[in-house]
Structure formats: structure tokens, C-alpha cells
Amino acid sequence: MTLFILTETSAGYALLKAKDKKLLKRDDLATEASTAEGVSNLLKLKSFQKFDSAATALEEVASLVEGKVTPRLASLLDEVKDEKKVSLAVADPKLGNAIGKLPGLSIELVADSSTTDVFRAIREHLPTLIPGLLPQDMSTMSLGLSHSLARHKLKFSPDKIDTMIVQAIGLLDDLDKELNNYAMRVKEWYGWHFPELAKILNDNIAYARLVLKMGMRTNWESSDLAEILPEEIEGAVKAAADRSMGTEISQEDLEHIQALAEQVVGFAEYRQQLAGYLTARMNAIAPNLTALVGDLVGARLIAHAGSLTNLSKSPASTLQILGAEKALFRALKTKHDTPKYGLIYHASLIGQATGKNKGKMARVLAAKASLGLRVDALAEWDDDATEEDKAALGTEARYNLERKLAAMEGKPLKPRGVAIAPNGAPQAQKFEINEARKYNADADAVTGDEPASAKKSKSKKLVEEVQDEEMADAADSDEESDSSDEETDKKSKKSKDSELEKLAEKAGLSLKRYKRKLERGEIQFDAEGNPSAVSKKDIKKAKKEAKKSAKGEEKKRKRTDDGEVDNSEKKKKKKKKGEE
């Protein structure tokens, strides 16, 4: 069987023919193929199909990585169709399966470990097998193709858009930490000069802006603080600056303090821009998740999972406790209760719930968020789809969850049957005018014209079958007897109930309790017939006493019986002695 070897290079496809049909079964293959002369003695070039450009090479190699047979490769394999009993060695088993499915191609494919030595020798001595191919050109083409293939993979990566959210939420957290550190440093530094300001003004950003605006506290008269502070706080700040107990500082100290305050104000402004950017990205990438849990919580969930695709693959139970891994494994190790929520705890819906309802809302919210995530990650939308259409599932689910939370908390429910705005708030539906019903004049009738029988029973049929008089009389008599029996039963029940009510009142019990105790045997009647309730303990004592008395009577009976037997035996003995 003739052996052909398919080799994919950065320059093109090479189809090599083995001079020895049993090449793959030889034991000395590795030693003979170690040199260029040995490889040229073992293999011969059948045909070579060169790539036209670098773009063509990238398309061909990308399709080979996915296990697809391109038209260029199929045309190369057509040269082997006419030959009989042919085997083809391929390096990739995935590509071998795709070649085996080509119509009209009867080739035995070999893609196992026996081909590794052959392909290693071909890669080392490829320029000797293909005439006109220089080693320098081969290395340059391989390097360019590898770079192009790497860019192609990054360009079409499904996780590429998630990196923006992951980096943005990480930077937002870092900015919050730095802002807190810098703001506290400004307060401590400027507090030596104006210590009363920290007690009056709690906002860090307003504090930094005031430091930039006023500078020395002695400039309080000439500085206009109306742009930064309201009138009440402005008056308190100026009054405190007038009688401050702080120390004096130099102009150089103030410059350094103001430089740090500028950093605080700049970080605060950039943080607002970054928060707006993150909100826009979350609404574009994961609109349903954002509608349910918010942009910050959703971004933290995506960052913790690594990507939107990974987060969408996780079930609702994992989503619920995502971020609480330490507490989860600690609880499993110590055999305590597992945590109910992780990062999802900071969602507004869970924050609105109280006490016991937080765990329920976390479970339900995680279930709805997992559904919304799968829509965000896997749904394919048309170009005409709006943001409201993409976030419809999450908005409707949030509205239903708010109704459920209100029902659990005992608050008034939101109205049903209303349209839902993009922000989740209910809004009025479109008002539609339906055509009025026409008045049917033929249905009118005068009430006085109806006969007496029609007035009494309007639901009778228009046509009825009339039975014989005897049958009618019998039926009437049966009905009368049945009705009379029912009336007597009702009267007897009423009389029994009234008697039971009287007895229950005498016993000092309700009717239900009296009936229950009567069934259990806990009601006793005196000589006059008045009922009285007896406790279970008294009944048990009475039963025990009855058992004791019964046992005593049995013993007495046995004694009397034994005495009678002894007397009869004595009499018999006396009679026998007299006869003797």
C-alpha cells in the first residue's frame, strides 16, 4: 500500500510520498531520518501548493486549527484519488476525520503515534525536501504567520469585551481606597492649622475644595465659599475660622497641602467619569444582569468569575454564594450552616428585605440573574434591537421580584397589568377605544304581558314532555315523602344540637369541646343528669382502682371456692368412718 504524508507549512501544503511502503513500521526510522540525506532517501515530494499571500496563509491555518478542509487542500488531495490502495499520514487526528468524510476519496488515514518520528524529521529538514525553499525565508514566514494567528485569536475572542469591565471595576475599587487615604491625609495635615473644620464638614471632596479655595484660615473674609458650601455651613465655617485654635503654618506647607487636595479633587472627578463609563458598558454587555442587581454588583460578579461566559455557565446556587468562598469552605469544614449570599448581598433588592426574607430574596434573585446572564451571553440580537428590548427580561423579572418582596414584607403590592419603563418603574399602558356595542331593539319586551308561571320560573324549557296522571301522582308522592323525610331529619338534628348546647353550657364547655370529650368518655353525669368534665388523670385513677377492686374480688372468690372444697372432703371422710 502506497504511503503519502500531508505536511502543513507556513509556505503551503506539501504532499510527500514514501519510497518504502512499510516506512512507519521500521525500527530504525529515527536513526535514518536524523540527517538530511537520510530524509531525502526515505521521502520524495509529490506536489506542493504554495500560499499566495500572508492573508491566505492565515485563513488556511485558521481553518486547519478548527479541523476544516479548505478548497485548496481538497484540490491537493484530488491528485491521490486515481491511485489504488493508498494510505495518508496526517499529524492532526481532527483534520484526519474531516478528510475521511470527503466524498469520492477512499484513503486509509493514519493519525497515531507512529507518525511522530516522520513529522519530526520533516520539520527539521523541510528545505531539503522542497526545492527553492530557503531556511531564512521559512523562519520569517513562520514568525509572521504565528503573529497573525495570535492576533486573529485575540480579535475573535468571545471574552475580549469582558476585560474592560474587569479592569474598570478593579480601578474603581483602587480609586476608592486611594481617595480615602488621600482625603484622610489632607484632613490630618490641614487639621493642625484649622482643626474645627473637620467637625463641621464631613464631605471629603468638599473639604479638599475648601482647602484649595480658602488656603489660610485668615482668608475667610475675602474667600467666597458659596459655590462649594450652602449658606448655613458657610457661616459656621467662617465663624469657626475667626476663633480657631489651630497653629500657624508657612506658605510652603500650604502649597504641599493644596497639591494633595488637588489630587483628591482630580481623583474624585475621574471616579465619576469611570463610574459613568462602567454603567454604560454594563448596560451594553449585560443589560439583564444590570437591571436585576445593578451595575456595580454585576461588574463585581463578572470580575470574580473571570468573564461573562464563565459567569453564565455557573448555576444559580453558585451565583448566590459567589464571593463567599472562605465562609463556605469554613462552614463545610466545621459542619456549620453554609452562607446564604456572597457578592449578591449588596444588590438593592436584598437590601430592601428584612431579616429572614434576605435569604429567600437572595435565592430567587440568583435564579433570575442566572437566566438573564444566559440571555446576555448567548442571545443574538438584530441590528434594529434597542436597549429596552435587550433588557426586557431583566426589567420584567425585577418588577415581579419587587411584588414578591412586597408580599413577603406585608407591604402594598404594585399594580398588575401595567407597562414597565426601562428603569423598572411601572407606567400607564396605551389607551385604546373599542367600538361601542349596538343596542338590540328586538330584545325588548313588556313585563306585564308575561303569564304567572313564566314569572315564577323563567328557566323552564319551552317544550316539555307530559307524563301520565298516575305516574305524575306517584312521582309527586315520592317527592313529597322525600322532602318530608329531609325535613324531619333536619328537625331532629336541630333538636339534638340544641340539647347538646344546653348540656355544654351546664358543663362550662363549648359545643365542639363537649362533643370531643363526650366521644372520648371524659363527660360524667350525676344522679340529676347534669354533665361534668373529667380530666384524663382522674379517668386513669378510676381505671386503676377498678382493676384493683376486680383483682380483690377474684381472690375472695378463689378463697371461698377452696373452703367449700375442703368442707365437702371432710364430710365425705366422716361418712366413710361411720360406715366402717
Curated annotation (Swiss-Prot):
Spans annotated as Disordered: 444-580
Pfam families from the UniProt entry: Nop (PF01798), NOP5NT (PF08156)
Every Nop domain range: 285-410
GO molecular function, one term: snoRNA binding
Chief place of localization: nucleus
SUPFAM superfamilies: Nop domain (SSF89124)
GO CC term, one of those recorded: small-subunit processome
Presence of keyword Ribonucleoprotein: yes
Stretches with biased composition (Acidic residues): 465-487
Subcellular location per the Swiss-Prot or TrEMBL entry: Nucleus, Nucleolus
Residue ranges, compositional bias (Basic residues): 570-580
Keyword entries, A-Z: Nucleus, Ribonucleoprotein, Ribosome biogenesis, rRNA processing
GO biological process: box C/D sno(s)RNA 3'-end processing; endonucleolytic cleavage in 5'-ETS of tricistronic rRNA transcript (SSU-rRNA, 5.8S rRNA, LSU-rRNA); endonucleolytic cleavage in ITS1 to separate SSU-rRNA from 5.8S rRNA and LSU-rRNA from tricistronic rRNA transcript (SSU-rRNA, 5.8S rRNA, LSU-rRNA); endonucleolytic cleavage to generate mature 5'-end of SSU-rRNA from (SSU-rRNA, 5.8S rRNA, LSU-rRNA); protein localization to nucleolus; snoRNA guided rRNA 2'-O-methylation
SMART domains named in the record: NOSIC
Family statement: Belongs to the NOP5/NOP56 family.
Its job: Required for pre-18S rRNA processing. May bind microtubules.
Protein name: Nucleolar protein 58
Organism in which the protein naturally occurs: Aspergillus niger (strain ATCC MYA-4892 / CBS 513.88 / FGSC A1513)
